Amino acid sequence: PNYGEQKTSGLHYSGAFENGQAAMCNMGSWFLATMQKYNAEASANGVQPVNFGIVKYPHPDGAPAGSTLGTVTSLAINANSTKKEAAADFLNWCASEEAAEALAATGNFPAVSSDKTSEIIASTDGFPNDENSKEALKTTAVYLEMPLSDKASEIETILNTEHDAIMTESETVDEGIANMNEQVQAILG
């Protein structure tokens, strides 16, 4: 299906990828665990598993090969908590190598990464067997997908709206970029 049909039918991109309607899916690291689960449950669900692999993210000129995108997922302690010390202990554990290895064992990518966590991820059930997929785990730099800003949510709404307009051919790429720039600048002042 084209983008408009996919959007109006409610077909999620993971479904389009899983059923072969999309040849590739530009997704975050979390999608690996999604695909591993899909394949593990495929037989019981009466569908075929997907033979897939992963590759390194394309990088712009000037960025080292192996560069990728990342985002911030925050953990916090409620100021009104009666268990602040226990919460702080948990947060410290979350940032530890032990926690990174535990998360990697589930096929997910921890915030603290190392050669060891990459080896663990590559050894999880359902990880693609090809060398390119293993090589894709080796990154050289991680850049924020979106700069930290209290306006990030408003800006993302603009980006998504203009993306939809471009993908449904309601406007050209140049028009969409111009609209994004104008609307984002209005928010940033």
Indicate where each model-derived feature is located.
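A residue-level marker of the well-folded mature domains of exported/periplasmic proteins
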Residues: 8, 14-19, 58-61, 77, ...
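Extracytoplasmic ligand-binding clamshell segments of periplasmic binding protein
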Residues: 1-41, 85, 176
